[in-house]
Swiss-Prot record:
Described purpose of this protein according to its UniProt entry: Negative regulator of DNA damage repair which specifically deubiquitinates monoubiquitinated FANCD2. Also involved in PCNA-mediated translesion synthesis (TLS) by deubiquitinating monoubiquitinated PCNA. Has almost no deubiquitinating activity by itself and requires the interaction with WDR48 to have a high activity.
Protein name: Ubiquitin carboxyl-terminal hydrolase 1
Modified positions (Phosphoserine) in chain numbering: 16, 42, 67, 474, 767
Lineage of the organism: Eukaryota, Metazoa, Chordata, Craniata, Vertebrata
Listed GO MF terms: cysteine-type deubiquitinase activity; cysteine-type endopeptidase activity
Residue ranges, compositional bias (Basic and acidic residues): 45-56, 233-243, 252-264, 709-718
Catalytic activity annotation: Thiol-dependent hydrolysis of ester, thioester, amide, peptide and isopeptide bonds formed by the C-terminal Gly of ubiquitin (a 76-residue protein attached to proteins as an intracellular targeting signal)
Region spans: Disordered: 1-21, 34-56, 233-342, 362-414, 684-725
Length: 784
């Protein structure tokens, strides 16, 4: 029966799988539980898992492995401050870095900030501030951009100085946040709200345009204040001439004019108020004084009347004169006509011509003597106002060439600072173009001038698109490398007007053929060249960017440039490249912006002594929101990773990385704190820095009781201040020497990261041999 045994075994094998499966599952489960409890199992899989778990533990627990990395980061840190990305704000960070290193920009912003801070203090001291508050809010809002720029400049300089003096405190990064400036831009232009990518050239035009408007507003306010002061002084002189008597208001005005004269340099002429100073004591006997007063006055209609009639009519004439002078404020020509009967037959200049040519009129009035004494009073007060406001940074009248000998040098020095301040954009970035049209028949020329702040040049020929459509083999045919001079020649090319677009000549009196050219008439200190790297493309349509795709055609860019070929007059000016804004990406609404800046002019570097105070004072004096509460208040609902420096007595190297987990929409970025509140807190950082020193001095004086101890302490404090001044000078010289190591080197600013770029690598990225995605977008040349 051997054949039956295999059949039984087969039958068992058929019915056994279910049983074996049950047994095998239970067996494997028991085996896994044993593996979990048995620590002496030496299988290969267990060894692998133990090694993997051990590696995980080794990566987390020891801190010694991460220390070499931090040391390398500390060595790689450069003494240049980056800017944190606050959510697709690389377009703003790159422009701010270029403006920071732009020659003369920081000086002009500081000058404007000092003027604005003085104006704000004047508004606080004004008794009628409540009545004028509504009309001053708009001007303060327009001043906020200047205050935000100055606040950012101060924070960058202080952080740079702190790093150079204490480099061991900074291990992670050396960067600050332009949050206040970003909030100001969002207030001025709601387009920058949210976290969308924007054009770097547009934000540059927005910043420069608002600075220019602020400068014009400051000019108008200074001229208005000067006109109001001249009107008030003129009213006082007219009241004296009309009434012939002395009232309480005249006594106050005479005292004010006497105080004014004491402050001014003395001349060889006398004022009428000096001869009448004795009459102030005898103001009770008006009837006896009326006769000598009328003899000293000019020939007016009031002299023909009797003495009693004059005294009775005096109080009636005063309000009439005041009303006429008040109504004459809007138009100065009318005031000249109405008040002409009070003056002699000689022609009197208008008020506007007075404060436009103060020196000339003042010298003429002094030579004529007593008949022009009242006008001399007006000119004296106007001279005082002009000198005070010029010394304080206010506008100086263009015609004030003849000045007192003592203040001529001061005015000439302040005039240059005033021009840099009020004409910051015009001097640095704004030039003038001439559109010249020449008739081909009569050879007559017509010119039209317009201002420009940047030059937009092409990077490829217009016919290239037609070639791409006709070519079937290669979508990007190889073309010869274009240069920047070729691009500028395309911008200033001669255009021939023919056919239906003929030019109507005024000399020929009919339509003729003409040539139109664009030339440079006035060149600024800094030339901004905008490369038109984005063009409309139907094949690669970008719904967010409006169909603008990137043109990656390389353009040969020189380090030195001369525009004499396209200028209206011969010039020897040459420009050197000092900054480039690069764009990497394929569309205008995406990608990333970086800035490359060449460090130059460190020998003429001017550092503020307020940036080299003690760390505690430095932290208290920073106008940027540096504490956690202020940063959270200004951050609002930002969903990005930012670094916050702890204020107070903490070290500035402590960096806290915070991230909000609240969900926000595409157009988020709402602000919880208004910009003017930040302006009120940090409009004058010098005062904030100075307050701890004053508190220490007051505490020291309160501890002493005797005068001798106070004098000793004053001597010690004076010695300490001398030592501190020497220490500040040593710190400043050390910082300057440390920065001179980077003279002539190119720095790459990639938001918060700063790197040194070799000149060869920079030239390769500037004029690449291939067509990379990272190409130059904005070129900045400064006058050499």
């Amino acid at each position: 029966m051997p054949g039956v045994i295999p059949s039984e075994s087969n039958g068992l094998s058929r019915g056994s799988p279910s049983k074996k499966n049950r047994l095998s599952l239970k067996f494997f489960q028991k085996k896994e539980t044993k593996r979990a409890l048995d620590f002496t199992d030496s299988q290969e899989n267990e060894e692998k898992t133990s090694e993997y778990r051990g590696s995980e533990i080794d990566q987390v627990v020891p801190a010694a492995q991460s220390s070499p990395v931090s040391c390398e980061k500390r060595e790689n840190l450069l003494p240049f401050v980056g800017l944190n990305n606050l959510g697709n704000t690389c377009y703003l960070n790159s422009i701010l870095q270029v403006l920071y290193f732009c020659p003369g920009f920081k000086t002009g912003v500081k000058h404007l900030f000092n003027i604005i801070s003085r104006k704000k203090e004047a508004l606080k001291d004004d008794s009628n501030q409540k009545d004028k508050g509504s009309c001053k809010e708009e001007s303060l809002a327009s001043y906020e951009l200047i205050c935000s720029l100055q606040s950012l400049i101060i924070s960058v300089e202080q952080l740079q100085a702190s790093f150079l003096l204490n480099p061991e405190k900074y291990t992670d990064e050396l960067a600050t946040q332009p949050r206040r400036l970003l909030n100001t831009l969002r207030e001025l232009n709601p387009m920058y709200e949210g976290f969308l990518q924007h054009d770097a050239q547009e934000v540059l035009q927005c910043i420069l345009g608002n600075i220019q408007e602020t400068c014009q507003l400051l000019k108008k306010e200074e001229i208005k204040n000067l006109a109001e002061l001249s009107g008030k002084v003129e009213e006082q002189s007219l009241q004296k001439e009309e009434t012939g008597g002395i009232t309480s208001t005249e006594i106050d005005s005479m005292r004010n004019t006497e105080d004014v004269k004491e402050q001014l340099p003395k001349g060889n002429w006398k004022r009428k108020s000096d001869s009448e100073s004795s009459n102030v004591k005898k103001k009770v006997k008006l009837s006896r004084e009326s006769q000598p007063l009328e003899e000293n006055q000019r020939q007016t209609r009031s002299k023909r009347k009797a003495i009693g009639d004059t005294l009775e009519a005096a109080p009636k004439i005063i309000p009439k004169c005041v009303s006429e002078s008040e109504s004459a404020k809007p138009s100065q020509k009318k005031s000249k006509v109405k008040i002409n009967w009070l003056k002699p037959s000689t022609k009197q200049p208008s008020i506007l011509s007075k404060f436009c040519s103060l020196g000339k009129i003042t010298t003429n009035q002094r030579s004529k003597g007593q008949p022009k004494e009242k006008e001399g009073d007006v000119e004296e007060d106007l001279e005082k106002y002009g000198s005070d406001h010029t010394a304080n940074g206010g506008p100086e009248s263009p015609g004030s060439s003849v000045t007192p000998v003592d203040s001529s040098e001061a005015k000439s020095g302040n005039k240059g600072a005033e021009q840099i301040g009020f004409e910051l954009v015009e001097k640095l970035f704004q030039g003038q173009l001439v559109l010249r049209t020449r008739c081909l028949e009569c050879e007559s020329l017509t010119e039209r001038r317009e201002d420009f702040q940047d030059i937009s040049v092409p990077v490829q020929e217009d016919e290239l698109s037609k070639v791409e459509e006709s070519s079937e083999i290669s979508p990007e045919p190889k073309t010869e490398m274009k240069t920047l001079r070729w691009a500028i020649s395309q911008f200033a090319s001669v255009e021939r007007i023919v056919g239906e677009d003929k030019y109507f000549c005024e000399n020929c009196h009919h339509y003729t053929e003409a040539e139109r050219s664009l030339l440079f008439d006035k060149m600024p200190e800094v030339i901004t060249i905008h490369l038109k790297c984005f063009a409309a493309s139907g094949l690669e349509f970008d719904c967010y960017g409006g169909g603008l795709s990137k043109i990656n055609t390389p353009l040969l860019t020189p380090l030195k440039l001369s525009l004499e070929e396209w200028s209206t007059k011969p010039t020897n000016d040459s420009y050197g490249l000092f900054a480039v804004v690069m764009h990497s990406g394929i569309t205008i609404s995406s990608g990333h912006y970086t800035a490359s800046v060449k460090v130059t002019d460190l020998n003429s570097l001017e550092l503020d002594e307020g940036n080299f105070v003690v760390d505690q004072m430095c932290e208290l004096g920073k106008p940027e929101p540096l504490t956690e509460e202020q940063a959270r208040g200004t951050a609002g609902n930002y969903d990005d990773e930012v670094s916050i420096r702890v204020g107070g007595n903490a070290q500035p190297s402590k960096v806290l990385n915070k991230k909000n987990v609240e969900g926000i929409g595409l157009l988020g970025g709402q602000k919880s704190k208004a910009d003017y509140e930040l302006y009120n807190k940090a409009s004058n950082p010098d005062k904030v820095v100075g307050t701890p020193f004053t508190d220490n001095r007051n505490s020291e004086t309160n501890d002493t009781t005797n005068g001798t101890h106070e004098s000793d302490r004053n001597k010690e404090s004076s010695d300490q201040t001398g030592v501190n001044m020497n220490g500040l000078e040593n710190k400043i010289s050390y910082v300057v020497q440390s920065l001179k190591e980077y003279e002539g080197k190119w720095l790459l600013f990639d938001d918060s990261e700063v790197k040194v770029t070799e000149e060869k690598d920079f030239l390769n990225s500037l004029s690449p041999s291939t067509s990379p995605t990272s190409t130059p977008y904005l070129l900045f040349y400064k006058k050499l």
